[in-house]
């Protein structure tokens, strides 16, 4: 596990005492930028310079932000089922590169697969990473199947430490797993 980051104790104290708005402000103003920096330095060597990223978006923007800022994709697509304004705003605030938001009408296999295929034809690249961390389980399942079918790298942001009472990862313990790499896994 990572050493305690600079603002972790202060953030924890605020959150555990019910000061959730102040805790969230501290987290995104001070703590999260340090998390991003550490995550980038650990995992940026896993990706090519001309990578395309497709992210599944649920209610937590942090994993998308971590992966996007680590990969630094030439094109980035974020797929979601709803426009969650505050979540989208966080992604816009922290993601260094521009991204294309693609809202799908439902989570059926055909809708998700077709949306991914449209992106594939649009980018005309063979270096595609699909981040399956966010999104509904049905989206993640279809994205994983699609990634295997079209030889896309598949990533997942996990964590080593978890704060049960806050239902959040311990800051600084985030891990990037390459779940599937078509050049290695067959």
Regions found by a protein language model. Give the residues of each.
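Long, low-complexity, Lys/Arg-enriched
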Residues: 1-127, 138-186
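Short glycine-rich phosphate-binding loop at a beta-alpha junction
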Residues: 127-133
């Amino acid at each position: 596990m990572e050493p305690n980051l600079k603002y972790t104790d202060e953030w924890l104290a605020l959150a555990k005492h019910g000061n959730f708005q102040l805790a969230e402000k501290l987290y995104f103003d001070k703590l999260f930028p340090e998390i991003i920096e550490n995550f980038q330095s650990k995992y940026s060597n896993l990706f090519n310079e001309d990578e395309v990223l497709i992210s599944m978006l649920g209610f937590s923007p942090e994993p998308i932000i971590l992966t996007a800022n680590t990969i630094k994709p030439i094109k980035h697509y974020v797929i979601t089922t709803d426009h969650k304004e505050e979540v989208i705003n966080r992604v816009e605030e922290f993601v260094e590169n521009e991204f294309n938001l693609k809202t799908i009408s439902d989570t059926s296999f055909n809708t998700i697969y077709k949306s991914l295929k449209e992106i594939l034809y649009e980018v005309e690249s063979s270096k595609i990473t699909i981040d399956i961390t966010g999104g509904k389980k049905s989206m993640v399942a279809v994205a994983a199947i699609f990634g295997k079918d079209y030889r896309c790298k598949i990533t997942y942001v996990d964590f080593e430490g978890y704060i049960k009472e806050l239902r959040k990862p311990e800051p600084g313990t985030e891990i990037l797993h390459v779940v599937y790499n078509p050049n290695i896994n067959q």
